[in-house]
Amino acid sequence: MVIGILKESGAERRVAMLPGEVAVLIKLGVTVIVEKGAGMLAWASDNDYLAAGASVADRKDLVSGSAFILSVNPPPEDELQIFSEGQTLCSVVNPAENREWLEKARLRGLTVLALDIIPRTTRAQSMDILSSMATVSGYKAVLAAASALPGFFPMFMSAAGTIKPSKVLILGAGVAGLQAVAIARKLGAVVEVFDVRSAVKEEVKSLGGRFIEVDGAKEDSAAGGYAVEQTEEFKLKQQELIQKHARLSDVVIATAQIPGRKAPVLILKETVQAMKSGSVIVDLAACTGGNCE
């Protein structure tokens, strides 16, 4: 079997597979071809891949010589013409947002494996790319907010006086949100967390966060741990609660997403305008429409 690893386009720094994982496949008898410069932004040089046992080629030769092709993001629509019938593409496809791309891939006779719709089950845990990336996103979101904030997360006491700890509001207590809670608390901030799922309340508390909620949220045990669409009445109550807490917060980190749908708008324009001068908003749902209006 021949596996090809594509170089990502644009500002994407990730690569589908690092040299260490390539070496494992090589030992199993798999042939691996890596596109030139694929790992450059992930600090993996072409020589590192060669040392792992892979070969390095340009995109055209890689595609023509591979049966199974890996990438973080799917290749652009205008490049699908270089792929052949019977090939398999494995990527983070976001099927709900990329129906046109999927249709063109189908017409080319390609098999597409969407890593982002693997169910969140114990059996599939080792392939759960969304949770892995969400952990990193939650961590980096707090560090980015702390860097941008013209203040400090922890409380400082000195001869000149006392500086109160920053208040951080986290919207969504999924993997990214819970990671953000943990890091913000470790940095000394006071953390409040909003989520429509009451089941995450104890997890938030165990990390040192204060859980805030609106009564009447709709939940679905079959949703695999994800949030579900709420009623209009609930959304109005939700917006009132979020505005009340956001106005008093120094940092708001938004992580709420619904699989296969546009992210819910939780932070309205008037909420942003009512927030304190110098406060920071980090919207991790921006790629699916954003939680911030």
Can you name each region flagged by the protein language model?
Residues M1-K104, R108:
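An N-terminal-biased, well-structured beta-alpha scaffold segment characteristic
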Residues L6-A44, P154-H245:
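Glycine-rich phosphate/diphosphate-binding loop of Rossmann-like nucleotide-binding domains
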Residues E8, K36-G39, D61, P74-P75, ...:
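Short, ordered loop/turn segments at secondary-structure junctions
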Residues V22, D46, L80, L102, ...:
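Generic hydrophobic/aromatic pocket-lining and core-packing "Φ" positions
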Residues V32, V56, L89, T111-L113, ...:
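Hydrophobic beta-strand scaffold residues
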Residues G53-A67, P74-P75, A222-V252, A256-Q273:
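A structured beta-alpha segment of the ubiquitous adenosine-cofactor-binding alpha/beta core
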Residues A96-T122, R261-E293:
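Rossmann-fold NAD(P)-binding glycine/threonine-rich loop
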